[in-house]
């Protein structure tokens, strides 16, 4: 409030503070105050587990299964990813993390070996194509 409105309120009430009616619940709370007697105060502590996100790598495993399934590593990674997702749904975060770690390693292995096989195949085809005219003569 600014200064002029305070003067108006004080003049309207005759200089006395306004008389507020006390709410019943407010009155009862102030009357009760602190607990009386020898009853001990009990506190309850609730431990809320923090939200832990365990990646299950299902999409990556599915991609490797469909497109880069070198020696069935993508399929095995997909199986471990599904196991990881199942463990996460049950609430076993340690088990889910272990399965997810295995799925991640298998996915990396499948990806690297498949890319190496593609590169080796391309290099082999190029070398054969470049040497083909020499072989015909």
Curated annotation (Swiss-Prot):
The modification Phosphotyrosine is found at residues 20, 27. Polyubiquitinated with both 'Lys-48' and 'Lys-63' linkages. Ubiquitination negatively regulates antiviral activity. Lys-24 is the most prevalent ubiquitination site. Phosphorylation at Tyr-20 is required for endosomal and lysosomal location. It comes from the Eukaryota. It is found in: Cell membrane; Late endosome membrane; Early endosome membrane; Lysosome membrane. It is a single-pass type II membrane protein. GO terms for cellular component: early endosome membrane; late endosome membrane; lysosomal membrane; perinuclear region of cytoplasm; plasma membrane. Its main location: membrane. Residues 108-133 are annotated as: Interaction with VAPA. IFN-induced antiviral protein which disrupts intracellular cholesterol homeostasis. Inhibits the entry of viruses to the host cell cytoplasm by preventing viral fusion with cholesterol depleted endosomes. May inactivate new enveloped viruses which buds out of the infected cell, by letting them go out with a cholesterol depleted membrane. Active against multiple viruses. Plays a critical role in the structural stability and function of vacuolar ATPase (v-ATPase). This is Interferon-induced transmembrane protein 3. The lineage of its organism: Eukaryota, Metazoa, Chordata, Craniata, Vertebrata. The gene is ifitm3.
């Amino acid at each position: 409030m600014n200064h002029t409105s305070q003067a108006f309120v004080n003049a309207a009430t005759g200089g006395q503070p306004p008389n507020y009616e006390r709410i019943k619940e407010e009155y009862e709370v102030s009357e009760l105050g602190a607990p009386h007697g020898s009853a001990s105060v009990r506190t309850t502590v609730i431990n809320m587990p923090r939200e832990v996100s365990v990646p299950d790598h299902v999409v990556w495993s599915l991609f490797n299964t469909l497109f880069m399934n070198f020696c069935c590593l993508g399929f095995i990674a997909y199986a471990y990813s599904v196991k990881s997702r199942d463990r996460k749904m049950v609430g076993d975060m340690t088990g889910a993390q272990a399965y997810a770690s295995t799925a991640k390693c298998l996915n990396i292995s499948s990806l690297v070996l498949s890319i190496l096989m593609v590169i080796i195949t391309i290099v082999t085809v190029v070398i054969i194509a470049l040497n083909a005219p020499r072989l015909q003569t």
